[in-house]
């Protein structure tokens, strides 16, 4: 009996009225046979003293794993009867709520698991409960928007909720808390949400970082009149890189598919896209050229195949150099000087840059970017991928808020002294 007493401590069952009678090891799980019994209380209806009647049919209560096996408690609860008014009552315990079968410790574990990126089906499988139980616990979470404040620095972006449909997300740049997740990214949806904030609150926003999605520009200016728009530097470089890539493909396709030039440009395309300062000087045998060459020597050979390729490559590298050194005057001076001399693919990018000049200058002068929100989007994609997608947007939204806005305390490890 003393061993069974220690088992109640091990299982963190603090109710002294629960007595463990036996433990049965099944093939797939453990069963803990227990009973709940205490002295008869007064009748809640008439006030007379009730008497012990019999035991209820065992309640099958799922519990946390023990020794790596699923565990459930078969708890027989005492019933009481009032012989004055015939009132029947079942014994109660803090282990589970009245009229419930899921113990509090399992509900706590569900909440803890929801903070992680695990899918709800996996949580249900790990805890030996139904997915519906996990969803009910998810619906217990309530997140209220605080319309009395906004951070001074915000990040805007979008992510894919369903195929072909993008959703909007806004994040506090410094604290990394999610401000809102909206089902669509149209101007009407975003405007209607942020207009819930008073104009005085919106005027306190100083910086908004975003990617190069032009419909956001005018909307941000109207909603946040004092905010500077900072474009994400990654997307600016990406525009130049894509223009260079398309230019390379067009020039490559001018050669015959079986020619040496076509095969060389196709095989070593990364050298053209790569920043020239990062080219390796190590010499290796290159089967395409049948000689030992460095990456820089290969690049020189590729550029010798086309004057257009060489001209646009050097221009591309010079733009990257000025951009990474954060020299907006030289960067835009080079664009303006070459606007009419470059291929239409580059002209399109240059015109976009000139149109968004103020926002790109902000990106070069201010130490803000969308990198933190892009990292958040990767976590959102992970939640979605683990769950094989979501049908219900509200459930998806709650998972995002739980995973990203609720901070999980880290265990502080204490090293033992030798």
What is the role of each PLM region?
Residues 47, 60-165, 202-205, 209, ...:
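Short, positively charged, Gly/Tyr-enriched micro-motifs
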Residues 99-101, 179-201, 207:
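Active-site beta-loop-alpha junctions of metal-dependent nucleic acid enzymes
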Residues 48-51, 87-90, 115, 119, ...:
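Non-catalytic alpha-helical coupling and interface elements of nucleotide-dependent molecular machines
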Residues 93, 171-177:
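Gly-rich Lys/Arg/Thr-decorated short loops/hinges at beta-loop-alpha junctions or inter-strand turns
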Residues 1-87, 91-93:
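Short, conserved DNA-binding cores of transcription-related domains
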Residues 40, 45, 51, 138, ...:
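Acidic/histidine-rich catalytic cores and adjacent linkers
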Residues 99-110, 121, 180, 324, ...:
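Acidic, glycine-enriched active-site microenvironments
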Residues 236-257:
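Short alpha-helix plus adjacent loop in nuclease-associated cores
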């Amino acid at each position: 009996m003393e061993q069974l007493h220690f088992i109640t401590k091990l299982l963190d069952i603090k109710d002294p009225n629960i007595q463990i009678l036996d433990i049965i090891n099944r093939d797939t799980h453990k069963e803990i046979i227990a009973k709940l019994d205490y002295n008869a209380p007064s009748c809640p209806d008439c006030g007379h003293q009730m008497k012990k009647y019999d035991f209820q049919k065992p309640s099958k209560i799922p519990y946390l794993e023990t020794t790596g096996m699923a565990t459930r408690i078969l708890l027989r609860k005492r019933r009481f009867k009032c012989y004055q008014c015939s009132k029947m009552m079942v014994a109660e315990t803090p282990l589970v709520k009245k009229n419930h079968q899921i113990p509090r410790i399992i509900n706590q574990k569900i909440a803890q698991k929801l903070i992680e990126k695990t899918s709800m089906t996996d949580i249900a499988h790990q805890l030996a409960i139904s997915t519906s139980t996990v969803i009910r616990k998810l619906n217990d979470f309530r997140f209220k928007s605080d319309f009395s404040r906004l951070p001074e620095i915000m990040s805007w972006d979008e992510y894919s909720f369903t195929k072909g449909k993008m959703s909007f997300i806004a994040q506090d740049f410094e604290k990394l808390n999610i401000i809102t997740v909206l089902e669509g990214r149209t101007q009407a949806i975003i405007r209607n949400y942020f207009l819930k904030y008073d104009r005085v609150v919106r005027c306190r926003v100083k910086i908004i970082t975003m990617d190069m999605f032009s419909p956001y520009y005018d909307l941000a200016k109207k909603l946040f009149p004092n905010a500077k728009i900072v474009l994400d530097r990654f997307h600016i470089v990406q525009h130049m890189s894509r223009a260079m890539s398309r230019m390379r493909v067009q020039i490559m396709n001018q050669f015959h598919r079986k020619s040496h030039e076509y095969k060389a440009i196709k095989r070593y395309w990364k050298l053209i896209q790569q920043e020239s300062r990062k080219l390796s000087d190590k010499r290796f045998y290159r089967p395409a050229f049948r000689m030992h060459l460095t990456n820089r020597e290969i690049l020189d050979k590729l550029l010798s195949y086309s004057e257009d390729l060489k001209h646009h490559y050097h221009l591309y590298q010079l733009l990257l150099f000025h951009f990474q050194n954060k020299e907006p005057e030289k960067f835009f001076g080079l664009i303006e000087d070459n606007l009419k001399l470059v291929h239409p693919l580059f002209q399109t990018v240059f015109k976009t840059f000139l149109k968004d000049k103020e926002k790109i200058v902000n990106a070069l002068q201010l130490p803000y970017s969308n990198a933190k929100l892009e990292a958040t989007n990767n976590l959102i994609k992970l939640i979605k991928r683990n769950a094989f997608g979501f049908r219900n947007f509200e459930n998806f939204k709650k998972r995002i808020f739980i995973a990203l806005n609720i901070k999980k305390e880290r265990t502080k490890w204490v090293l033992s002294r030798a």
